[in-house]
Amino acid sequence: DNVSILLRYENGTNAVINYFANGSKSYAKERIEVFAQEKVLILDNWRKLEGFGIKGFSKMKSTMDKGHKRQFALLNERMKKGGEPLISFGSIVNTMKASFACIQSLKENRWVEIE
């Protein structure tokens, strides 16, 4: 249950998704690291955000909030009143293409390019 996924986007940026099931339960379950323009943001378990190279910001703590409550409130509002979808159809399609490409890559042990 361990996998590393490298995504390379059309604009030249890269993303790496690591999923490891063999770590300690005492370590944060989810961690996001963003590197851009000599700045770094690290979000640990949706509770602690640290920033490096960002003038006037170093860290912030909060309760865990993955946005589910707000997402369902917005979805309910859109269903009642209409409006733009919360996630564009194109984004959903691209996410599915990337998901299927990951599975294909793991099965065939090769890089998979998405058109």
State what each model feature region is:
Residues S26-Y27, G67, L106:
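A generic fold-level signal
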Residues S26-R31, F52-S62:
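A short, polar/proline- and glycine-enriched secondary-structure boundary/capping micro-motif
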Residues D1-K48, F72-G83, I114:
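Contiguous beta-strand/loop segments that form the cofactor/metal-binding neighborhood of enzyme cores
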Residues E38-L41, L49-F52, D65-G67, N109-V112:
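Short, intrinsically disordered/low-complexity patches at protein termini
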Residues S62-A73:
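Active-site loop of classical SDR/Rossmann-like NAD(P)-dependent oxidoreductases
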Residues V16, M60-K61, P85-S88:
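A short, structure-level motif marking secondary-structure boundaries and short turns
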Residues E10, E77-E115:
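C-terminal helix-rich "cap/oligomerization" subdomain common to oxidoreductases
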